[in-house]
């Protein structure tokens, strides 16, 4: 009886250890995949580049977190995060929407970051800056509209739904800013997948609507 009880406990421990080992291995594999995806940026914007940037320019980066990793896998696009460049006290900053769990500032939603801070978290040193040209005085209008949403403290859209205007994920912020200054006409490339609509970053490579200012990116055709 005693031997039987000891044997049973031994088997339970063995199974538990094996299960734990599998879970740990699976978790490690996932962490390794994410680690291979991101890393703090080594990008240093020169003064010449900084002088060429205007308020209202758009900046794209490849995000440095697990959400960006999965987003890139879903959209099959290089870039995963975007924002609108503005200027305060002669300093370039970025208005963008980020979830509180990944925001370095622990703000959930539309927020203001320095351009340096934004660039520092460009994973794999992938960065793209472009200028909107789809309406007259687009830069001024884009920056002004972005500030309106910043002042409203719009929270992050964790459901990633384009149907709601009271919460924004990153490209959704730009989607509504662009529509507001373009007589409610959409310029975003939209892709439907699994009953959801995705706002694609390929939008910013349309030379009819945007002009490239600066780019560090792989040679990919959009």
What is each model feature region?
Residues 67-68, 124-189:
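Active-site nucleophile-His-acid catalytic modules used for acyl/amide transfer and hydrolysis
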Residues 18-88:
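N-terminal accessory segments that precede or flank the first globular/catalytic domain
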Residues 61-127, 155-168:
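Glycine-rich catalytic cores of cysteine/serine-nucleophile enzymes that process amide/ester linkages
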Residues 18-25, 158-222:
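Activation targets extended, charge/polar-rich intrinsically disordered C-terminal tails
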Residues 14-16:
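C-terminal motif of bacterial Sec signal peptides marking the signal peptidase cleavage site
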Residues 2-8:
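Sec-dependent signal peptide recognition
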Residues 101, 136, 194:
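Residue-level detector of flexible, active-site-proximal loop/helix-junction positions
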């Amino acid at each position: 009886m005693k031997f039987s009880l000891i044997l049973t406990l031994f088997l339970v421990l063995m199974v538990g250890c094996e299960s734990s080992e599998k879970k740990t291995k699976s978790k490690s594999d996932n962490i390794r995949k994410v680690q291979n995806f991101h890393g703090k940026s080594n990008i240093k914007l020169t003064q010449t580049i900084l002088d060429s940037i205007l308020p209202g320019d758009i900046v794209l980066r490849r995000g440095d977190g697990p959400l960006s990793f999965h987003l890139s896998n879903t959209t099959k696009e290089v870039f995963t995060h975007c924002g609108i460049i503005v200027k305060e006290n002669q300093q370039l900053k970025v208005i963008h929407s980020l979830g509180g769990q990944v925001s370095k500032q622990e703000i959930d939603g539309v927020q203001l970051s320095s351009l340096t801070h934004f660039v520092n978290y460009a994973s794999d040193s992938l960065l793209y800056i472009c200028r909107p040209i789809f309406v007259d005085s687009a830069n001024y209008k884009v920056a002004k509209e972005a500030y309106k949403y910043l002042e409203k403290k719009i929270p992050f859209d964790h459901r990633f739904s384009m149907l709601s205007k009271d919460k924004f994920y990153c490209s959704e912020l730009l989607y509504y800013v662009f529509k507001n200054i373009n007589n409610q006409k959409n310029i975003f490339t939209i892709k439907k997948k699994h009953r959801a609509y995705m706002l694609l970053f390929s939008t910013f490579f349309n030379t009819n609507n945007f002009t490239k200012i600066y780019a560090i990116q792989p040679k990919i055709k959009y």
